[in-house]
Amino acid sequence: MLSRLLRDDKLLEVFFSSLDMKKSYLLALSGGSDSLFLLYLLKSRGVAFTAVHVDHGWRESSYREAEELKIRCEEEGIPILIDHVPPEYRTSRDPENAARRYRYTLFHKVCKEQNLAGIFLAHHANDQAETVLKRLLEGASLSNLKGMSPKTSYEDIPLFRPLLHIPKQIIINVLDAENVPCVQDITNTDERYLRARMRKKIFPWLEEIFGKNITQPLLTLAQDSEELSCYMKQQAEPFLENMRKENTTWSIEIPQVLIEQVFLTKWVCKEFFFRAGVVASRHFLQTVYDHLQRKLPAQMRLRDKRVIIKAGVVMIE
């Protein structure tokens, strides 16, 4: 079944055709269905990689499971490193994020030490839908609902997520058909964590209320957001070419033709502030736009900077 999936999945084909097969990579291997699926996928495509498993110590059985993973990888001829999260990370105020930071720091370190060209992560379509819904409910802007990208980076190391379009159920079906045993991580269903509550309660409740699957509409929204973001970057760049820096003062001209386009004006201002080294909130951008639109001069504080608005000009110093 795995070979049939490879043959029929055009997005996977495009992804692997662009991958530098002369290099070696790192696979973040939890031992769950998603990362095991990715392990066999990479192996079937002839990708050279080292698996890295991080034992978080959240379950009594986790040490034994790590050893079983090591044996499985050795039987498959796959190099594997096992690491254990120090106890202080498990007792922090936010153990989930603390463990995540530990993992990524470790992955980065291993990549540097072994000259690995990137990190493979097994996030799938359901993970993507959760990310989009979470960002939507947190009030993210339209252009920030795009979710995770198939190719990003952590510091200077590329991150690859080739499974973002594949639903969790397909992954499970393939592994069941191949009789591949997986680790069942109980933290994935522990309702102390937001992601677990989303999987166990929020998504099932929404699908029951709407009477249909909501994963695909959220993935479509993420794609629309990605396309909007790309379009806005193209539209904004000619105006951002007007940015100037003199000593410690940044400035940009905001012509009337731009002010007539509300969304684009706020996008240009947001990017201007970002390139000048500060992040502007949605409320702050609206205030800046209101002054530009009404031609009202103003001075405001943004973090430790002073923002000056004059006729058709925004400055930050």
From Swiss-Prot:
InterPro entries: Rossmann-like_a/b/a_fold (IPR014729), TilS/TtcA_N (IPR011063), tRNA_Ile_lys_synt (IPR012094), tRNA_Ile_lys_synt_N (IPR012795). It catalyses: cytidine(34) in tRNA(Ile2) + L-lysine + ATP = lysidine(34) in tRNA(Ile2) + AMP + diphosphate + H(+). It is found in: Cytoplasm. Its EC number is 6.3.4.19. The keyword DNA repair does not apply. Keywords: ATP-binding, Cytoplasm, Ligase, Nucleotide-binding, tRNA processing. The N-terminal region contains the highly conserved SGGXDS motif, predicted to be a P-loop motif involved in ATP binding. Ligates lysine onto the cytidine present at position 34 of the AUA codon-specific tRNA(Ile) that contains the anticodon CAU, in an ATP-dependent manner. Cytidine is converted to lysidine, thus changing the amino acid specificity of the tRNA from methionine to isoleucine. Belongs to the tRNA(Ile)-lysidine synthase family. This is tRNA(Ile)-lysidine synthase. It comes from Chlamydia caviae (strain ATCC VR-813 / DSM 19441 / 03DC25 / GPIC) (Chlamydophila caviae). The gene is tilS.
